[in-house]
Amino acid sequence: MGIKRQQSIQLVGMTEAHWADVSRIYAQGISTGLATFESEVPSRENFFESKIPELSLAALTPEGTVAGWAAATAVSHRPAYQGVVEHSVYVDQEYAGCGVGTRLLAELIALASRHGYWMVQSSIIADNDASRILHGRAGFREVGRRERIARATQGESAGQWLDTYLYELRL
């Protein structure tokens, strides 16, 4: 079933028309306490303002539902860092383990390279094994651990200090 699902997924540029599903999937990630330190889904306006349009993707099912999404933001507005982006990949729980995240990340990397970016990075909560494995398989390297960087607000770790790992891929 996973292979069939993966093959039937179409990657497209994310637009505001995808927001209902994107925000639903984002909320799933928030509730786990492992995907982000956000405590609530941002407004549609704030979400899209912060993302680089050419590095924003939605994975669509044949029915047009979003099965996952990936997006990148600028790390800094300083000219020296103009080629460095930080990204996120979120997959609907129903599609976890079906290759959706792998396809989204591979396409985001290809787009970043095509658009002249030279570094893609991600800060991953230490207990998010699935994301760490995904990034390792995609060629990212772990470059550092930030200990007790933030206190979890959601999930089983709520109230606890958590570590993150910084992963990067030079294009």
Task: Label every PLM stretch briefly.
Residues 32, 38-94, 105-106, 168-171:
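Acetyl-CoA-dependent GNAT
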Residues 6-9, 84-86:
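Short, solvent-exposed beta-strand edge segments and adjacent coil->beta transition regions
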Residues 8-22:
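A short beta-loop-alpha structural element at the N-terminal edge
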Residues 97-112, 133-137:
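Conserved acetyl-CoA-binding loop-helix of GNAT-fold acetyltransferases
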Residues 112-124:
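Conserved GNAT acetyl-CoA-binding A-motif
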Residues 71, 79, 121-125, 136, ...:
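Conserved catalytic-core motifs of GNAT/GCN5-like acyltransferases
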Residues 21, 86, 119, 130:
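Amphipathic alpha-helical recognition patches that constitute DNA-binding helices
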